[in-house]
Amino acid sequence: MVLKVISANQAVAEAAKLAKPKVIPVYPITPQTSISEYLAKYVADGELDAEYIRVESEHSAMSACVGASGAGVRVFTATSSQGLALMHEIVYAAAGLRNPIVMANANRALSAPLSIWNDQQDSIAERDSGWMQIYAESGQEALDSVLLSYRVSEDRDVLLPSMVCLDGFILTHTVEPVDIPSQDEVDTFLPEFQPQAVLDPDEPMSLGTFTDPNYYMEARYEVERAMERSRKVIAKACQEFSEMFRREYGFVEDYRCEDAEIILVAMGSVCSTLREVIDDMRDEGKPVGLLKVRIHRPFPAEEIKKAVSNAHKIAVLDKNITFSVGGALHTELKALLPDKEVYGFIVGLGGRDITPEHIMEIVRKTENPERTVSWIGLKEESQ
């Protein structure tokens, strides 16, 4: 391994290079752009043997990914916000066609109003598309998640695309030390892609043909079954990754939850801030813990239940809004934990800072609740 001080975007690009994709269709968009720039440089400099396609839009990027994956090669792309929204039509097609594409998404708010700053609305809008979703907390986790995603997506029992999500600017442009595995290590962990069905003119077949009501429902059921099968594949891949690279990952990560009366639940980079504040609260005698949801799809229901089993109250921080019912993760936990008091907090939309004071406010509101869903960090005149 080599330790480099790099941004999370460069970490993602390094991971993609190590995975040796053969086709990389990308359209640049802030704050993802430097991922595509690094990959273009790797290809131009001869460090990566791949076809780098400069497409005219994100819709075309995902379309090219689907075509290349259908032709039997490993594929990578990256996008953000409006770019992911433009891909929406083909995002669903990729899952239905069982293309094991890996895509990095630099989480950014959706327009309108136009914003280039972070929240997680873009990827949450695709949570039901059939893609697996991982939310990274650090540059190291972003790099590792790309490698793990290929390992899981390409498994014959899964064959579903993966989206590695990293918070725009907060993570994408933050520079920190990242351990980069050697090519030999990655080649051992991630063997060459062995496609199951390939578009080959010498052996013609059809993929994604018109389907009438006699077959469509079964096709969607197969995606659901693959998503369920991915749980065991993910667990095995994480175990083997830990043995090889000495970094442990799972569906969730709990911190000081054993005796916690209140557990804060979140995804992404905010978890680093939450740990610091929780330590301060513990020093003051407040029994608070953190549950980081790392893998959002497949949804880690049993892991969440186990982690929060001893807590009385759950506070869910969502960087998204599902209008009229709160945030997406909050609605899922509220349905999952009917015997718990589950409160939702909308935070950080459009890049609004989530400060230690905001986190302490969330704990206070959970201790003495006035409503099920609260917005944190709003300007006073808006409240």
UniProtKB/Swiss-Prot annotation:
List UniProt keywords, sorted A-Z: Oxidoreductase
Top EC class of this enzyme:
oxidoreductase
pH dependence of this protein's activity: Optimum pH is 10.0.
Which SUPFAM superfamilies does the record cross-reference, listed alphabetically? Answer: Thiamin diphosphate-binding fold (THDP-binding), TK C-terminal domain-like
InterPro entries the record matches: PFOR_II, Pyruvate:ferred/Flavod_OxRd, Pyruvate_synthase_PorA, Pyrv_Fd/Flavodoxin_OxRdtase_N, THDP-binding, Transketo_C/PFOR_II
Q: What is the catalytic activity of this protein? A: 2 oxidized [2Fe-2S]-[ferredoxin] + pyruvate + CoA = 2 reduced [2Fe-2S]-[ferredoxin] + acetyl-CoA + CO2 + H(+)
Q: Which CDD domains match?
A: TPP_PYR_PFOR_IOR-alpha_like
Asked if the keyword Oxidoreductase belongs to this entry, the reply reads yes
Cross-referenced Pfam families = PFOR_II, POR_N
Instruction: State how activity varies with temperature.
Output: Optimum temperature is 80 degrees Celsius.
Q: Biological process GO annotation list?
A: response to oxidative stress
Molecular function terms, GO-annotated: pyruvate synthase activity
Gene3D superfamilies in the record: 3.40.50.920, 3.40.50.970
Q: What is its EC number?
A: 1.2.7.1
The UniProt entry, under NCBIfam families, shows: PorA_Arch
The record's note on quaternary structure and interaction partners says:
Heterotetramer of one alpha, one beta, one delta and one gamma chain.
Protein name listed in UniProt: Pyruvate synthase subunit PorA
State the gene name recorded for this protein.
porA
